[in-house]
Amino acid sequence: MLPGLLGRHAHGLYRADRCSAVCLDPVSLLSEIAPEPILKSIARGRMVVTDLEVITITPTSAVIAWTTRQSRLGVGVPQPVTAGTELALGPVNGPLRTVHDDPTPRAFHMVEVTGLEPGRRYRFKATSDGQQAHAALLPTLQVGSCEQINEFTTLTPPPGEYLTTIALTNDIHIGEKRQGIVLGSLPTSVQPHPDQVDYPQLMLSASLDDLTTRRGHPFVVVNGDITYANLPDEVELARQLLDGYGEQDADWVATRGNHDHPRRDDDPFGDVFVGYQRNQTILDPSGVRVLAMDSTRGSGGGWIVPDQYDQIMSELESDPHRPTLAVTHHPVTNEAAWTSISGPQFMLRASDRLRLQLLENQAPGVFLHVAGHTHRMRRDRADLLWAHTQYLENAACAAYPGGFSLLHLYTGGYLLNFWRPSDPDAHDWLYRSRWQVMGLGAHLMLG
């Protein structure tokens, strides 16, 4: 038993209410490896320094990003403008100190500052060539957001002993050729540049590489939509990339998403990963259980069939108090269903949403349920007023917001943070994919 794990809320989620130090040494500068934009010969015009985001806050670090570009004309991807990267940071009641000043011209700017103090409030100023970066996305424009007040508070670790870290990633879409809602010739999706056509592979590879080299090689839950259409070559490539990270069930587990649903005559995903509507249970050496369920039905919404309910109930009833991370590709709350731009028909059917929440409520150990599918980062409200389980939608890997989350577990609670990979090519693609759905998509994906 791991007492106290259920007693703390999630911290550090990527959304506007995450704002809550200066010990500035050492400083790790992700912008040193950030990309120069793909379009290198650009008329400067009027530079806009925008899309300011406090991406990640931990007890001892923060990641801040922004872009430089021309003013947007029409509905296409705006021209990037290259500029330098400067970040000043200091205690909220003290002077700002320059922690990074890199004149290398680039359009996507990202700086990670480490060596901060837990539970301390900092202020910052991000600039490029003397112009201050400003927020542009709806969640970052909320009153009191980190980006509006240019302040953040580092997190305080939960009490108790550190147990383990689990990485969460989803919506990879290997085999996909355009990002966004594809509606014929309408500009609702983003066409990758010729050297970005394999962007799903790029984003997964970059994430797995960061997890190996920068984040301690944690166990990874790859939570659905791993392929675009469950084609044999897509499944084979996905398996190859994951096998490069480690062994199935020992280093990673893969669930099925709606894009991975069985085809009419075959099921390549089932042949290589796991059969249709099969529950998977992973016991971490720390004692934490991962309950990986299959919520898929067809190409959109989802369900849970009776046989899988039997598997789920048998597992939970065998040890109801064991600390358990539950995952499905589809979100399982009504709030998620009714706030998604795709609507409730794109979600798990209503009866299954309620039944899963009831089952999890009967098992005191289920402290968190993580889903993907919507491509956004969002905490959801449980439908049961007395629920002890918390619910989270994790952002997509394949495109903007683009990355993975780390769930750090302690005996007294947990921390959860979103991270973007550090690969320069990944940054190039994030700059471009931010403009999916005619630029509206990014406003809907950050909480």
Positions of the model-derived regions?
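Extended active-site neighborhood of metal-dependent phosphoesterases/phosphodiesterases
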Residues: 133-158, 232-319, 343-355, 364-365, ...
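Active-site-proximal beta-strand elements of phosphoester/diester hydrolases
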Residues: 163-176, 287-297, 325-329, 390-396, ...
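His/acidic metal-ligating clusters that form di-metal
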Residues: 63, 85-87, 99-100, 207-219, ...
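Active-site glycine-centered loops adjacent to acidic/histidine catalytic or metal-binding residues
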Residues: 171, 224-225, 257-258, 329, ...
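Beta-strand-enriched, solvent-exposed domains that form extended recognition/catalytic surfaces
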Residues: 18, 22-157
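Binuclear metal-dependent phosphoesterase catalytic core
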Residues: 32-56, 61, 377-378, 382-447
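N-terminal active-site segment of His-dependent metallophosphoesterases
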Residues: 70-74, 139-231
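Acidic/histidine-rich helix-loop elements
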Residues: 99-101, 170-204, 262-274, 299-304, ...
